[in-house]
Amino acid sequence: VGCSFLVSQELTWNQEVVTFKSANPFSFEEIITNLDNEPVQDVSGILTLPEDFDPNIKYPLIIGVAGSLNWGPHHLKYLKMFQEMGFATFQLQSFDSRDVQSTVGTQTEVTTAMVILDSYRALETLSGHPNIDTNHAGITGWSLGGGVSLYSAWLPLINAINGGKFMFAAHLPIYPPCMAYPYPKENMQFSVAPIHILIGELDNWVPAAACTELIDKMYVSELPINIDITIYKDSHHSFDRVSEVTVNEEGYTLGDCRFPMNEEGSLWLSEYWHIPINKPLRQKLALLTCAGRGPSMGGNKEAREASFKFSAEFFSKYLKK
């Protein structure tokens, strides 16, 4: 626990900045095959305890992970709800810690791999906190953070990071990119902790179809799987924002992108073309084969309310003792 150099909001009495050591692996492959050689990166986040917290109690934890546009008001509203329910929350500051504010249109400065590592390093660090019960810890995130919440359940990554010593008890990915799928099916090795995806029917930034296809592949593998999905009707990317639907000209539309991933976390261009997508330039070239530009994003009142309600019920069910 320490002081941070970058905090995007003023702290209240029940908050503290927690700083820990992480790294900057570009890809899952770099975590699995080369983590010990990655240069150290200082990362911080904001730990918030419930306002009525008792210093003699250990609280269940929810780690929140932002999307490509960094933290927004609707994200913080979820965390506030969780705090009012008696959870401690950790607002991971992966972007600010690397002096990045947005990765829209590039997706290379702060990657899913980096933030998954950050999440587990945070979990390990918080295991030493006297008021945190990391045996009852969940993770949720939006867009890029949804990808973190999803693929942080992939066992080869967990084993490479900490040998399975620290794991999440529940994963709630909100409109995640589901375009990477472990291949062949023997690599579909996920935690048996519950995973539930929330996504919009009309999402063209990260399409729901990729997630339903991934889930189908998981169950076909006949390996232990505990995953489900809710698709909200008439809802775009960022359906839980309080905003009109607009087009983001810089963002990718990932409708047709699907990339197999081997046991070392290396993405290939396809099951037939084993061309690795393991560097920023190769990632950009791969996206040229399947992605467009100009996804839509914006709120849907019914989906937003349903998402908040589901999130509260999901974490209460799986994290409360």
Question: What do the predicted segments below correspond to?
Answer:
Residues 9-57:
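N-terminal cap/lid segment of alpha/beta-hydrolase-fold proteins
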Residues 32-43, 57-128, 289-296:
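Serine-hydrolase catalytic machinery in alpha/beta-hydrolase-like enzymes
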Residues 51, 93-100, 177, 235:
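Short beta-to-alpha linker loops that shape the active-site pocket of alpha/beta-hydrolase fold enzymes
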Residues 192-203, 227-230:
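Catalytic His-Asp charge-relay segment
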Residues 202-206, 237-238:
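Acidic catalytic loop of the alpha/beta-hydrolase fold
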Residues 225-321:
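C-terminal catalytic histidine-bearing segment of alpha/beta-hydrolase fold enzymes
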